[in-house]
Amino acid sequence: MPYFGICVLFLTVIEGEKREEKDMFEKVNAIVELVNGKVWGWGMIVLLFGTHIFLTIRTGFIQKASITKGIKLSVTKDEGAEGEVSQFGALTTALASTIGTGNIIGVGTAVAMGGPGAVLWCWLTGVFGIATKYAESLIAVKYRVKTKDGRMQGGAMYALERGLNMRWLGVIFAVLAGFASFGIGCATQVNAIATVCQENLGIPPWIVGIVIAVLTAVVIFGGIKSIANVCEKLVPFMAIFYVLGCLIILGINYDFIIPAIVTICKLAFTPGAAAGGLVGGGLRLAIQYGVARGLFSNESGMGSAPIAAAAAQTRNPVRQALVSSTGTFWDTVVVCLMTGLVLVTTIMKNPAINADEIANGGVLTSMAFAQIPYIGPVILVVGIISFAFSTVLGWAYYGERCVEYFAGKKGLVPYRVLYVVVAAIAPVVSLNLVWLIADTLNALMAIPNLIAVLLLSPIVVKETKKYINNLDAVDDTPVPVVETGHGQRKAKG
């Protein structure tokens, strides 16, 4: 299995720390940082943001329908339609993977590294990213397949294979997404849980790793229905709980909200310093970290959420695409924006905060929530634990579908075991290195998906025109039946 390499990487880092081989570790970190800088250069930023804008125009600003129709559809059920889980179950599974530490620590890191201006770029990535999430979800449902045992499978790999006859690129996407699941989906999340538990509850990281690993194993060995059942209950609770905490802080920092908005908008387009301890990271860094953390947060363009969308019971592709696109609205347009405002208002309110504290996204977030008497730290701890654990579950499902695509069902058990192992060892791995690796893999897996979305945009437009004003219409196109997750090669009928 190619995933053995990711485990070896983490074990190597751990062993290096134990032996105090700091030089080797620093070299590895420097190499990963260099690669990350190249991958997240202007080319990737233009490709991602350009795709968002292109699809916004091609779909006639689908964001309006996403908010007005998609939110309403997300709580309805298409019980007579084909699929494994409800539309709401598919949405919450996708939200479980997107509303994670990227919304809390990730935004803090963006502000720390890119300055306050990164918040606006993160938000804009979400606004325009709604169109991309819509398009990638539409083609995922359009080109999904059904296994002999009745499971629905879809995603960028199937769209590339069945829609563009590019199975080779579908395999590349599946492999990269499988690797990415260990980073964005597992290691970063468990590491964040371990950090907050150690700092606030005094629990040793290795104990946290074992507990999370056991809980993860119990759920993921139950399949998509088990994951969806947990997410349907967990996601609404954690989102409301966290948003209420943010609203309380913004109420405390009321006088600094308008100045914070002005500062964010100003530094998003011009380099320079701001008042109150804030440092402008420069235009390039503001855009780079804003867009990168926006992708980490909402995953629009990565091709991950459509894997869950493909399993939904839905009458037609447009119906589920609208539901899935609302995930980006809730994740980035609402949650990330509120986090950004909380952080920037906190820094402006406390100009004595030193540069080292601002440079640490996690510490910065902790300071912001500490403003709420007594329960502030509790809200942050509960928020990070619930957000992160739900992400671990959602990405486990994504990884499984990708592994099954290129390796068949025989690869599922080894993948699950390795996923649990990574969860167990993640708390003792360098957080900075883990985030760098995750960022790099996110960009790499996004490239094949963006190619699929752009080349299949005529199909997206055609399907949108067909169903957008007739959402109750049923798409009676037969779904191909496959023997395994190997796509069209073994399709029947």
Task: Tell where the protein language model's regions lie, with residue ranges.
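Membrane-interface loop-to-helix entry segments
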Residues: L47-F54, R58-I71, N191-C197, P204-C265, ...
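Helix-loop-helix module between adjacent transmembrane segments
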Residues: T51, L55-T56, T125-G150, A156-N191, ...
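Select transmembrane alpha-helical segments in multipass membrane proteins
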Residues: I45-G50, S86-A94, M166-A180, I210-V211, ...
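Alpha-helical membrane segments and immediately flanking helix-loop junctions
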Residues: G80-M113, I139-M157, E161-R162, V175-G178, ...
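Extracellular/periplasmic helix-exit of transmembrane alpha-helices
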Residues: E136-Y143, L247-T263, P271, A275-L278, ...
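N-terminal alpha-helical transmembrane segments of multi-pass membrane transport
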Residues: Y3-F4, L9-F10, E17, M24-T101, ...
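Flexible loop linkers connecting adjacent transmembrane helices
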Residues: F61-Q87, T109-V111, G115-V119, W123, ...
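Transmembrane helix-loop junctions in multi-pass membrane proteins
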Residues: F25-V28, T59-Q63, G102-V107, G183-A194, ...
